[in-house]
Amino acid sequence: MAAKNKIVYICSNCGFESAKWAGKCPDCGEWNTMEESVKTAVSAKSAASGYSSSASTLLTRPLAISEIDTEDEHRYHTGLSELDRVLGGGLVKGSLVLISGDPGIGKSTILLQICEYLGQKLRILYVSGEESARQIKLRAGRLGVSSPNLRILAETDVQLVVEHIRTEKPDIVMIDSIQTMNFTDLNSSPGSVTQVRECTNAIMRCSKSLDIPAILVGHVNKDGAIAGPKVLEHIVDAVLYFEGDRQMTYRILRAVKNRYGSTNEIGVFDMGEAGLRQIENPSQAMLSGRPTNASGTCVTAVMEGTRPLLAEIQGLATTSGFGTPRRMSTGFDYARMALILAVLEKRAGFYFSNLDAYLNVVGGLRIDEPAVDLAVAMALVSSLTDTPIRDDTVVFGEIGLAGELRSVSHIESRVSEAYRLGFTRCVLPYHSMKSIDSKRFSGVELIGVHNVREAFDACVQ
């Protein structure tokens, strides 16, 4: 006897499933997120599951790890070295990659640019649920994409998409976007928790069985998280986030999950009329246009994975026009900024209690490593005292609650990047001096300091 469909309630935020409705999700605690959905019988979906009977048979026998052949493991280079860096060396066969970001950030653009390079030798199937084939052609023309092996499919029915993949057998599949795909057998609208989960599963199974890499575009919700169930991020092999303000040209591509590489790498791009242009020297780009002999600005060296990056920190302290002073931070943790302000008042005698304090990381970067603490403090104190930090100085170090400076990692990489871009002075924690070979950096004056007061004196002398 065929199984019957049943009504369930699924949280649109976390994907929690319940047999009855509730105002508050028992799992994530969000209110008014439980949505009614019809759970379709397994038999109704089996035709579009993405598995063939032969593929299932092959996967049923356990294999000894020594029997598994990995000699033919191959990565497709995308033509964008910055993207390859984030992916861990390129696209792995049979992998499922999710690219997410705000609307207009460049997700579809980067897919078409990948098509232009890979499409010279490989067959690519580009599936769009948001645009017609004509619209994609017009956008591709603007970007200069004219690959002979690129096939466009404007379709939202995932069952038909899987069928086309099995028929065409492309080398790479791109889905733009996963939230527009739907199962016609499911009684829920595209983009719902059930639809997103089942459509992703179908594409994943098809991709794995045919050993075809697939790139999915994912929308984000108002909080910046990927729209749909959290299980979506567990299904895919890699999750890449595009960061950056649409009003600015810089874009940061960051991996938050990667089964085939590091999650500490970033790729830096510049969005222009001709699409995304990769920036292979991001430090120089981030510091372009930096004001000279101006108070409230400080250069620091941060580590993004194995890549050292110079960034400009800007601080502003000004008289408050309200009873309660305002605090605002862009690109740096607000709570960490408040902690640094408290340390400056208590341990160094720089008072911000009656002043508004603003902090900005230039270029749209988001920095969360403790090594930036000292640069944040120096930028704010420089603005408070209206005393410029020397233009040839790079600052980094972690600040403790006693006002002391703690050592940070990758000292030599940070100093090397600063020296490469012409900086001749580095103010760093005194204890970090032991881990650096000063003979390698004869052209850089290394100044070890014990606390924030010493650091400020060293920065302005």
What feature does the model see in each segment?
Residues 124-128:
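Conserved RecA-like ASCE P-loop NTPase motor core of nucleic-acid helicases/translocases
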Residues 2-13, 17-85, 92-100, 105-116, ...:
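Peripheral, non-AAA+ core regions of ATP-driven protein-machinery
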